[in-house]
Swiss-Prot record:
Gene: dusC
Coiled coil spans: none
Keyword match RNA-binding: yes
Binding-site list for FMN: P12, M13, Q14, Q73, K144, N205, G206, E207, G229, R230
Entry protein name: tRNA-dihydrouridine(16) synthase
EC number: 1.3.1.-
Active site: C103
Top-rank lineage group of the source organism: Bacteria
Sites annotated Interacts with tRNA: R40, N100, Y181, R277, K279, Y284, K300
SUPFAM superfamilies tied to this protein: FMN-linked oxidoreductases
Length: 325
């Protein structure tokens, strides 16, 4: 068993790990870093409000309420504009810059962003180099990649390009774009080969769901850093589970998190935001908590915020009553 404690980073999951979820999960965990949802860059220097909307932590020194640093992730294909927006993100307080070369979304790939860049290692090199040159050397530049578009044959060329461009570290999701998130397609061995090849830190990502899978991933890859996304939603205290081999959070504690989440003020919410996000989160939670299946069945047909909130409060009350008895 590997006894050293790994760096644990909270992944950038678009439309899932939003500022509210980051605030909640970093309060109950021990993350070393969290990465924002991507900021889409096209052909302009974006207004500050775009960065503040996606990463409001920038308004408080680049930290979550619990003190976890936030790194802004940029998505795009034009080196000049990626560089200009990277510079702005640093000025606003981002702890370094992350460049997205792994998002498998059809919409994103259709506009030549995210994983679509894996087809063009030279463009990845140019974009990463432009970002690195625009950002002060004291600020880290990282790149998140997959093993390739439809096969892993170019993974070394891509990783080499990222290192040669001056990136400080690289996060490798152990599947190709076409693999999607199929568990049986995870390839930690390829991450390990990249780690052996490079001189910069390599962070492993993909199918890290509990203490045992984290241990196995580290044994195979020899990576000292891990990035977790879906697993962090399945098991809300996963970083502590991985770092300290503690038990997963009890369902009663998960209910309290759901209660906190549904009560978080959101001035942009028209009444549907928390409704959709609670249902979405329950779908992740049911991978680790059978009780989440029952709660989802209760709320799935509820379309009002007040209705969902009432169901969550009732579930908390029932649980407290059961525990008291």
């Amino acid at each position: 068993m590997i006894k050293s404690i790994p760096r644990i980073m909270l992944a950038p999951m678009q439309g899932v790990l939003d500022p509210f979820m980051r605030k909640l999960l970093t309060a109950y965990n021990d993350y070393d870093l969290c990465v924002s949802e991507f900021v889409r860059v096209v052909d302009q220097r974006l207004p500050k409000k775009t960065f503040y909307r996606l990463a409001p932590e920038l308004l408080q020194g680049g930290l979550t309420d619990s003190g976890t640093p936030i790194r802004v992730q940029l998505l795009g294909q034009y080196p000049q504009w990626l560089a200009e927006n990277a510079q702005l993100a640093i000025e606003l307080g981002s702890y370094g810059i992350d460049f997205n070369c792994g998002c498998p979304s059809k919409t994103v790939n259709g506009s030549h962003g995210g994983a679509a860049l894996l087809k063009d290692p030279e463009l990845i090199y140019c974009a990463t180099k432009a970002i690195r040159e625009a950002v002060p050397k004291a600020q880290p530049v990282s790149v998140k990649m997959r093993l390739g578009w439809d096969c892993a044959s170019q993974c070394f060329e891509i990783a080499d390009a990222i290192q040669q461009a001056g990136a400080d570290e690289i996060t490798v999701h152990g599947r190709t774009k076409q693999d999607g998130y199929r568990a049986e397609r995870i390839n930690w061995q390829a991450i390990g080969q990249i780690q052996q090849r490079l001189n910069i830190p390599v962070i492993a990502n993909g199918e890290i769901l509990d203490f045992n899978s984290a241990q196995k991933c580290r044994e195979i890859t020899a990576c000292c850093g891990l990035m977790i996304g879906r697993g962090a939603l399945n098991t809300p205290n996963l970083s502590k589970v991985i770092k300290y081999n503690v038990a997963k959070m009890a369902w009663s504690e998960v209910l309290q998190l759901l209660y906190e989440y549904v009560n978080m003020p959101n001035e942009r919410d028209s009444g549907f935001y928390h409704v959709a996000r609670i249902k979405q989160w329950l779908h992740y939670l049911d991978k680790a908590y059978p009780e989440a299946v029952d709660l989802f069945q209760i709320v799935k047909t509820e379309h009002s915020y007040d209705g969902v909130k009432a169901h969550i409060e009732k579930a908390v009350g029932r649980n407290e009553k059961t525990n008291f008895q």
